Amino acid sequence: MAPGESAQAAGLALGRRITEVFRQPFVLDTQHVVVSLSMGLVCYPEQADDPAMLLRHADTAMYAAKRAGRNQLCLFDRSLELAVQDSLRLDGALRQALSGQEFSLVYQPILLAEAGALIKVEALIRWHSPSLGWVSPDRFIPVAEESGLIVPLGRWVLQEACRQLAQWRQENPQSSGLRMSVNVAAWQLADADFVTDVQEALAANALLPETLELELTERTLIAEDPTIEQNLSTLRQQGVKVALDDFGTGFSSLSYLSRIPLDTLKMDRSFIAELESSRRCRDLVQHIIAMGRSLGLQLVAEGVETAEQAETLTRFGCHLLQGYHFSRPLPPAELAERYFQSRLPG
């Protein structure tokens, strides 16, 4: 509470100071810990004049801060109520969807730059709700992360992707060298059972660890959670591959290369989009590829939409290409029909 004539300004200033304090790591049982802080601010009496309404509006603003990426301060606005109501509807529908088999996976091919052969696929989740219709992942994934549903949802994606890979291999001898790439969220990686979840998904489908690649974003690594790093290290030692997605968009991209055990760098699609129009972007992409190759990492360019982009990336030495120039994400049967007629690398 910040009383006074300029309560809003005082509240914002105080909130920013508190947020900055919590951005700093602190020591807990000899471990450096970083916590995220989400704050909601509401002004009395302009926005509410009774305690119950003040708390409700502050709570609404706090959840808006969480949706903005955590470590945020948000001032209440009437429009936020609609967003919160939408999130609550989505949360309820998500819980029902998990038990109602409303989710499915599609798979986008990732190809060798020089030979054009299919090397691996990226599993992408889709949701068709009976009441909401098709819901974009950009809309429901943040809600799943806020509610904690991302852990069981991510577990289902992992299990289904491994099951599908095993089925392809059983039905199509040409797919024997195919690998599966699965996106994982920070909440999953920090879960105590995550390593077991991966091991069980592989064992249940008789898959070797090296057939699975886990994709994580730079945002996942910002908190420097020791559990995340330990889980990744354990799985990589067992043979599971690790890829850093959207490389180059974070503030500390280079630090991750020395801290996190990685096999693959996926360059952010924003670089690829400007490849032909920006000399600076071309130089940056060329340097990222050269750096990755010197570190023994596999380079993937996603968001490739033109033949010119593909040719430039191949000339620069990028190993793998992914994007609509080659294929949209496909249902399992369509992908098998299109790609398993030619031999995959073994």
Can you describe what each PLM-predicted range is?
Residues 20, 24, 60-63, 67, ...:
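Regular, well-ordered alpha-helical segments
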Residues 11, 15, 55, 195-198, ...:
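Heptad-repeat coiled-coil signal-transmission/dimerization helices
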Residues 20, 78-82, 89-207, 219-220, ...:
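Bacterial c-di-GMP phosphodiesterase EAL domain
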Residues 31, 113, 117, 130, ...:
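EAL-family c-di-GMP phosphodiesterase catalytic domain
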Residues 25, 32-40, 72, 102-104, ...:
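Residues at or immediately flanking beta-strands
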Residues 1-88, 92:
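Cyclic-dinucleotide signaling modules
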Residues 1-5, 144, 253, 275:
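Active-site loop/short helix in cyclic nucleotide turnover domains
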